[in-house]
Amino acid sequence: MPEPHAVLYVTNELSHIVKDGFLPIWKLTGDESLNDLWLENGKYATDVYAYGDVSKWTIRQLRGHGFIFISTHKNVQLADIIKTVDVRIPREVARSHDMKAFENEIGRRRIRMRKGFGDALRNYAFKMAIEFHGSEAETLNDANPRLHKIYGMPEIPPLYMEYAEIGTRFDDEPTDEKLVSMLDYIVYSAEEVHYIGCGDLRTLMQFKKRSPGRFRRVLWHVYDPIAPECSDPNVIVHNIMVDSKKDILKHMNFLKRVERLFIWDVSSDRSQMNDHEWETTRFAEDRLGEEIAYEMGGAFSSALIKHRIPNSKDEYHCISTYLFPQPGADADMYELRNFMRLRGYSHVDRHMHPDASVTKVVSRDVRKMVELYHGRDRGRFLKKRLFEHLHIVRKNGLLHESDEPRADLFYLTNRCNMGLEPSIYEVMKKSVIATAWVGRAPLYDYDDFALPRSTVMLNGSYRDIRILDGNGAILFLMWRYPDIVKKDLTYDPAWAMNFAVSLKEPIPDPPVPDISLCRFIGLRVESSVLRVRNPTLHETADELKRMGLDLSGHLYVTLMSGAYVTDLFWWFKMILDWSAQNREQKLRDLKRSAAEVIEWKEQMAERPWHVRNDLIAALREYKRKMGMREGASIDSWLELLRHL
């Protein structure tokens, strides 16, 4: 059966280009009815180019159809908003008539648009959940460390510990300058940072520009004789050399219970020193930083210390939890960072990291880390791994038990969880928001397996849990939470439809057939495909109709095709309660709810769309055909329908 497709809507100045392509082309006149649009879009089994007048349709209606807006201009006028285009085509590409360049531009942008979908779900989760499972750097970037608990199983970065493997080299990309990267991966939950050896504050100001939110939530005590005055109210400059803990203690208020971080990046000038003197000085500076941090371990949650590898020692000792390479460092910079887990108050539970202790270091092993991981052309993924490893609490969400509201985004169907489907459904049942991959097209960028859409629908819907495809979830949040998910959101609806999303939300009252619930693009085509490939699948429905009875073809084809994810509980309530009303009452409920639809049959406006027995007959027939293969309980739905 076909997978979800996108409608690649181009404005008129690009319509000549798409005529040279090989995808279908859909010309819109502006005179189409709701049903015309629904039926025509349902005939396409691949992405399709479209152009013409769409000004009478709202953004939610067009997103419901899978529209992506492409133009050389900034905006497109729709019925309810002026929409910022999703893909802005450079004018030189438009003038060149180069179809490959045009389609590459669309493809590259669509990959970036996936982030908009994930960010929108996370924004909802940040309002509703405390615990986040399966987390990566994207969650850390926007989480509130004083409120949210971030769990996951991130990749472990290269680390030096006694008797442990360093790790193997991996592909990487360039990143920020070394010291900016250092602040980027180490600053997360700390509210007070004591930064010794801050230099001229350029690093701190670059970090402020890169991550203004994280910069603002920290009180910075910076220590360096050359540090200039700073106008930022959360930066306190101390123009001193730090020789002992006394130099820092006098600037700390122990009446405040805050998480503190200690950063030591001290390096004196070489001046006239010979090699031996210079190495001895550097070694002493690094050890002094460790000793001060360790002595003040009750005041700081952790420390990050400069760690220069001596040339003249085969082995030496330091106080450390981990040594690790530096993202953005030059390939010939034989200097690491030393992370020390200390005993001070922390918002993040870092008990899985060992306490800092005296560690023996073998010089050739740590030099190997430099050779494997340093270089100006490297560092981006190393920095991400360090950020995740230091600040994400390592727990498997499938096994975690807690009463806190939780979010489970983009990890449940990782291939490592194959065979654990019952646990996945249990998590979706108790999660505030969860996602699972249901797409059947080949996956090139992710290592996920697909859950069957029909099983997800039958397993995932409860009185207090909505189960929708990803596009339906975004449309639902646009409707119910317009302050969280804005109408102008840029995302790829076809990509989103590859996910099932569960939301701990009640059924809307009244249970209207909003776009988020009812789209079923291509349902008529799916029905025809079933008939021309295997007519026995329709025999029972045909026989019932000949007898003057009915079976909900809508429900039956939805389940048999495996092409849709929508919320059964809400849909049944919509059929039995809302559709049983007359035309006037139906329209009144739609208006009162500010709901929108993309299918409306005027001939059915005064009648129920189905009756209870139609739904029961469809489920029974589905059970008869697929019951042995269906992993979900159909009997429980039959029982529910009898009493709903």
UniProtKB/Swiss-Prot annotation:
Keyword rRNA-binding among UniProt keywords: no
Alphabetical keyword list: Capsid protein, Outer capsid protein, Virion
InterPro entries for this protein: Orbi_VP4, Orbi_VP4_C, SAM-dependent_MTases_sf
Subcellular location: Virion
Transmembrane segment boundaries: none
Pfam families reported for this sequence: Orbi_VP4
Cellular compartments per GO CC: viral outer capsid
Domain of life, source organism: Viruses
Principal location listed in the UniProt entry: virion
Role description: The VP4 protein is one of the five proteins (with VP1, VP3, VP6 and VP7) which form the inner capsid of the virus.
Family named by the database record: Belongs to the orbivirus VP4 family.
Name of the protein this chain belongs to: Core protein VP4
Organism in which the protein naturally occurs: Bluetongue virus 10 (isolate USA) (BTV 10)
